[in-house]
């Protein structure tokens, strides 16, 4: 992909942030107010970002949404610049975090699903898998708009034992949260996931590609420290 200049990077980052929070296609007006630039300037920049493969316009009359390439840029950007979420982590402090028993991991997974509003998978071994938070996951806007998401993610959980068996040994080596999206994701091309190893078990945060990666990554780092 062609390298973006500083203004393009800032604009694309803001567009993705807005879309992650709202799930609404982004127009030039919202960005011009946020960046103190004219709507015309923003429109031109967004058109260029679309030509470069970072944005698409789902409908003629709508704004634009990020592509997989945009999310890859976003993930690299937040890791490089150590961008933090605005989540109130005192909400997580009330939970007692332990990793001594299977029940500790299961309880943690349920709490993470509540905090992140996503699904959590815990693989104790290749053949011992627990997951929770499907109702949280399916409450995301993607699943209300497009049945293909419901079908794809339902198939994912139907086949979760086989999928975990295929990735467990490799992903257990991860020392930092590993973020994989779209075509790079072992679960689904419609999926965003963060994988993390804690005390010999593999924890996976699973959501649509439009998931809050900053929040999920910080959450995994926080509970593991």
Predicted regions located by residue number:
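Alpha-helical promoter-recognition and RNA polymerase-docking modules of transcription initiation factors
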Residues: 2, 21, 35, 220-221
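Short alpha-helical segments that sit at the start of domains
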Residues: 1-13
């Amino acid at each position: 992909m062609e390298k973006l200049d500083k203004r393009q990077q800032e604009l694309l980052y803001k567009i993705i942030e807005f879309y992650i929070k709202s799930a609404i296609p982004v127009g030039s007006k919202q960005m011009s107010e946020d960046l103190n630039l004219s709507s015309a300037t923003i429109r031109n920049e967004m058109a260029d970002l679309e030509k470069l493969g970072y944005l698409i316009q789902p409908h003629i009359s709508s704004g634009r949404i990020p592509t997989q390439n945009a999310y890859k840029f976003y993930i690299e950007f937040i890791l490089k610049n150590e961008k933090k979420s605005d989540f109130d982590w005192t909400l997580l402090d009330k939970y007692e975090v332990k990793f001594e028993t299977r029940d500790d991991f299961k309880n943690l997974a349920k709490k993470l699903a509540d905090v992140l509003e996503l699904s959590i998978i815990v693989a104790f071994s290749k053949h011992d898998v627990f997951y929770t938070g499907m109702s949280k996951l399916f409450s995301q806007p993607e699943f209300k708009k497009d049945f293909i998401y419901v079908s794809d993610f339902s198939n994912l959980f139907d086949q979760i034992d086989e999928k975990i068996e295929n990735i467990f040994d490799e992903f257990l080596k991860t020392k930092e949260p590993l973020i994989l999206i779209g075509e790079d994701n072992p679960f689904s091309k419609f999926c965003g996931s963060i994988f993390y190893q804690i005390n010999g078990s593999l924890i996976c945060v699973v959501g649509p590609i439009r998931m809050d990666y900053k929040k999920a990554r910080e959450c995994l780092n926080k509970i593991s420290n």
